[in-house]
């Protein structure tokens, strides 16, 4: 017959296993809904292609931003000289955001059996979150026309980055 201390330890370890099993079961359904399964049947993009796509995403996003600023100032002349339209202002934020997205793509290809599906939805969610500061500066009284251009810039960055990454650094089939 086991001593009382042994019985308490056995019950404690059984309880811990049960709790961990309950947590695992609770996380399995949400993970399955977003295809976060850690069992992809494909190979990750080639590292060189990811690097190329990263450079192209940064360049394409900065170019899109610059063009949108030019269009925005042409459409709304009162926005000329707007502080957030300076390359030094939007450029560093664009580069940081694009680099984060470019780092996320190979990670998602490793943890998801449907990385394009998950990356697309992640890009939408992140873009919506990144619009919040724009709404805040609009609330603070920044010019509506200028803030609208900033919002379009966010959308352009998301479109450029997503498309460049999934096309220039696609997942590879299994061997």
What are the functions of these language-model segments?
Residues 1-17:
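N-terminal acidic, proline/glycine-rich, low-complexity intrinsically disordered segments
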Residues 21-73:
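N-terminal signal-anchor transmembrane alpha-helix
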Residues 132-149:
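Membrane-helix boundary connector in multi-pass membrane proteins
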Residues 106-127:
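Internal alpha-helical transmembrane segments of multi-pass membrane proteins
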Residues 61-70, 98-106, 131, 158-163:
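Transmembrane alpha-helical segments of multi-pass membrane transport proteins and ion-pumping complexes
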Residues 87-100:
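Interfacial helix-start motif at the membrane-water boundary
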């Amino acid at each position: 017959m086991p001593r009382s201390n042994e019985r308490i330890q056995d019950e404690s370890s059984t309880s811990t296993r049960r709790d961990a099993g309950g947590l695992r079961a609770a996380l399995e359904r949400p993970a399955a809904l977003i295809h976060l399964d850690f069992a992809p049947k494909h190979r990750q993009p080639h590292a060189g292609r990811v690097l190329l796509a990263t450079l192209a995403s940064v360049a394409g996003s900065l170019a899109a931003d610059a063009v949108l600023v030019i269009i925005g100032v042409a459409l709304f002349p009162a926005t000329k000289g707007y502080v957030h339209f300076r390359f030094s202002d939007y450029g560093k934020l664009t580069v940081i955001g694009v680099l984060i997205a470019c780092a996320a793509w190979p990670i998602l290809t490793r943890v998801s059996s449907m990385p394009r599906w998950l990356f697309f939805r992640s890009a939408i969610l992140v873009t919506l979150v990144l619009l919040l500061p724009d709404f805040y500066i609009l609330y603070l009284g920044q010019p509506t026309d200028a803030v609208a251009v900033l919002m379009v810039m966010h959308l352009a960055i998301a479109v450029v980055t997503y498309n460049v990454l999934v096309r220039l650094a696609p997942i590879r089939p299994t061997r």
